[in-house]
Design a protein with these regions (language model features):
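A conserved regulatory-domain signal marking ACT and ACT-like small-molecule sensing domains
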Residues: 1-90
């Protein structure tokens, strides 16, 4: 199952390392990533495979929320199927 992780907040050292570290810890494979700094704001989108994630979807959201709070950033996890359903893909 594919999902998108988006990260937005003030640019600080270690953002990519911490988010990718959590992915590694939870057996989430990062398939693609893009990031940019926009006037001092960090923005990143990761396409990930969560099919072998070692925790439930609910616990994954909790862990992402906890990391976001620690870092003072916004982190969202959205399954690709949400977007596919909106455009009529199965």
């Amino acid at each position: 199952m594919k999902a998108f992780i988006t990260v937005i907040g003030h640019d600080t050292v270690g953002v990519v390392a911490r988010v990718s570290g959590l992915c590694c810890e939870l057996n989430i494979n990062i398939e693609d990533v893009t990031q940019s700094i926009l006037q001092g704001m960090f923005a990143m989108i990761m396409l990930v495979d969560i099919s072998k994630c070692s925790v439930s979807h609910e616990e994954l959201h909790q862990k992402m929320d906890a990391l976001a709070a620690e870092m003072g950033m916004q982190i969202n996890l959205t399954r690709q199927e949400v977007f596919d359903a909106k455009i009529g893909r199965a």
